[in-house]
Amino acid sequence: MIADSSSWLKLTKKVRFGDTDAAGVMHFHQLLRWCHEAWEESLERYGLEAQAVFPGCRGQEQWPAIALPVVHCRADFLRPVHGGDQLSLHLTPQRLDPSSFEVHHRFLLEQQDVAHGWIRHVAISTETRRRSALPDAIERWLEASLIGRISEL
């Protein structure tokens, strides 16, 4: 696992032509897709294999016992985002309770906020479909994200 969280909580995203609408600005639904992809990339950069978190991966002998469905998402658009823009993306994970967490995604263009996205996940048993504790791998990722960050008492 990587100790320096800036390598897995601070990412970049180049806006591609296919991400934009007829007006040449980012189509609204792309933001939540980017949020989820950034979370996946963050887990990967941190050192977690996709098979440890996501079902259906190639070569996976057994699916994870715990699923992490998205139960809430939100996006705020502050400024237009155009094709070719190189965005900085900062992730701030937060454990909400023993079975859920949320990731805040902050998108910046030239150090100016252009959008924010939030995605909330709840851990459920794949067998019973009832809430369960977060998987150990996600717990480690959440704990590591707190290192060097001041949190409220």
Curated annotation (Swiss-Prot):
Database matches in SUPFAM superfamilies: Thioesterase/thiol ester dehydrase-isomerase (SSF54637)
Entry EC number(s): 3.1.2.28
Q: Which domain of life, per UniProt?
A: Bacteria
What keywords are annotated for this sequence in UniProt? Hydrolase
Catalytic activity reads: 1,4-dihydroxy-2-naphthoyl-CoA + H2O = 1,4-dihydroxy-2-naphthoate + CoA + H(+)
The record's listing under Gene3D superfamilies reads: Hotdog Thioesterase
Q: Does the keyword Hydrolase apply?
A: yes
Q: Which GO terms describe its biological process?
A: phylloquinone biosynthetic process
List the active site.
D21
Single annotated GO MF? fatty acyl-CoA hydrolase activity
Q: In which pathway does it act?
A: Cofactor biosynthesis; phylloquinone biosynthesis; Quinol/quinone metabolism; 1,4-dihydroxy-2-naphthoate biosynthesis; 1,4-dihydroxy-2-naphthoate from chorismate: step 7/7
Query: What role does this protein play?
Result: Catalyzes the hydrolysis of 1,4-dihydroxy-2-naphthoyl-CoA (DHNA-CoA) to 1,4-dihydroxy-2-naphthoate (DHNA), a reaction involved in phylloquinone (vitamin K1) biosynthesis.
The entry sums up its family as follows:
Belongs to the 4-hydroxybenzoyl-CoA thioesterase family. DHNA-CoA hydrolase subfamily.
Tell me the protein's name: 1,4-dihydroxy-2-naphthoyl-CoA hydrolase
Q: Which organism is it from?
A: Synechococcus sp. (strain WH7803)
